[in-house]
Amino acid sequence: MNELILNLKGDVSVPVEMDKIIPEKIQEMSLEKISGIELIQGNKTAKVSEIFDVELKESPVSKVTINNCCKKVKRIGEKMTSGEIVVNGDAGMYVGVEMKGGKITVNGDAESWVGQNLKGGEIIINGNAENYVGSAYRGDWRGMSGGKITITGTAGSELGEYLKGGTIVIKGNTKIMPGIHPNGGMIIIEGDIEGRAGGEMMKGAIVVYGKTLEPLPSFKFEGIVEDPLVKLFKKDAGTQLKGTFIKFSGDYVNTKPKGQLYAAIENNKNLI
């Protein structure tokens, strides 16, 4: 196994697309061949060696490390199926788009569309993420279907749009409309939200530990629950929550919805 180490040479003014640099694609390549890969940069292309200083060394796992990264470096880990990518610095849009396996860790902030249409694997952003975490392509009604995304900081609007499966965990606050149009999966928000969670929710679960505004009027109050076991489908082993929660079901703009919304009572006594 090899680890590819890419050290960004300097400031990047025109976005660079990194979809050709994923662990399974570069494993059998020589240093010379990797250095010569053409990356899309704006309306032109540039060789890897023109943008990065390139190193290759043996590793127990197939791995790509990008150092001094910035938000002009886009599409990191797109469609990867195995191995590991570590980004030291910020990352541009589309981290882990259509990823099926492996692990991506960003030690910095990330722009919008983290884990768009994620199918498997794990993405960890050790910082903040912008809008549409774990969401669908524009115009598509099939979003993230598997895997796990963890944001240790804050997240923007409309995370989990059209979520079908998998888990999204936000350690900080989120903006408006988390979990819009979901048909499965679980969203756990440990911070506060600006409201309108679960709009047009059909299936799935949203758990809010921080403060939230009053749920949409098309959600139904189900009662107070203690340490609930949240099941997303009949044969699901379930996710055990700890604490006391206010439970709502919805969204009743749909016919026979099975969506679940939990708000920690400690921070949301105004909802009772």
Curated annotation (Swiss-Prot):
Q: Which InterPro entries match?
A: FMH_DH_FwdC (IPR054942), Formylmethanofuran_DH_suC (IPR017550), Glu_synth_asu_C (IPR002489), Glu_synth_asu_C_sf (IPR036485)
Subunit info here reads:
This enzyme is composed of seven subunits fwdA (65 kDa), fwdB (53 kDa), fwdC (31 kDa), fwdD (15 kDa), fwdE, fwdF and fwdG.
High-level lineage: Archaea, Methanobacteriati, Methanobacteriota, Methanomada group, Methanococci
From the UniProt entry, list the residue stretches annotated as the region 7 X 13 AA repeats of [GW]-X-X-[MLP]-X-X-G-X-[IL]-X-[IV]-X-G: 77-210
Its UniProt entry gives the catalysed reaction(s) as: N-formylmethanofuran + 2 oxidized [2Fe-2S]-[ferredoxin] + H2O = methanofuran + 2 reduced [2Fe-2S]-[ferredoxin] + CO2 + H(+)
**Its job:** Catalyzes the reversible oxidation of CO(2) and methanofuran (MFR) to N-formylmethanofuran (CHO-MFR). This enzyme is oxygen-labile.
- Per its UniProt record, what Gene3D superfamilies does this chain match? Glutamate synthase, alpha subunit, C-terminal domain
* Catalytic class of the enzyme: oxidoreductase
* Family membership: Belongs to the FwdC/FmdC family.
Q: Which PANTHER family does the entry link to?
A: TUNGSTEN FORMYLMETHANOFURAN DEHYDROGENASE, SUBUNIT C (FWDC), TUNGSTEN-CONTAINING FORMYLMETHANOFURAN DEHYDROGENASE 2 SUBUNIT C
Write out the entry's keywords from A to Z: Methanogenesis, Oxidoreductase, Repeat
Enzyme Commission number(s) of this protein = 1.2.7.12
CDD domains for the chain: FwdC/FmdC (cd00980)
Q: Does the keyword Oxidoreductase apply?
A: yes
Each sequence repeat occupies one of these ranges, namely 77-89, 96-108, 115-127, 141-153, 160-172, 179-191, 198-210
Q: Which GO terms describe its molecular function?
A: formylmethanofuran dehydrogenase activity; transition metal ion binding
Please tell me whether the keyword Repeat is annotated for this protein: yes
Query: In which organism is this protein found?
Result: Methanococcus maripaludis
The pathway noted for it is:
One-carbon metabolism; methanogenesis from CO(2); 5,10-methenyl-5,6,7,8-tetrahydromethanopterin from CO(2): step 1/3
Per the record, the GO terms for biological process are:
methanogenesis, from carbon dioxide
Q: What is this protein called?
A: Tungsten-containing formylmethanofuran dehydrogenase 2 subunit C
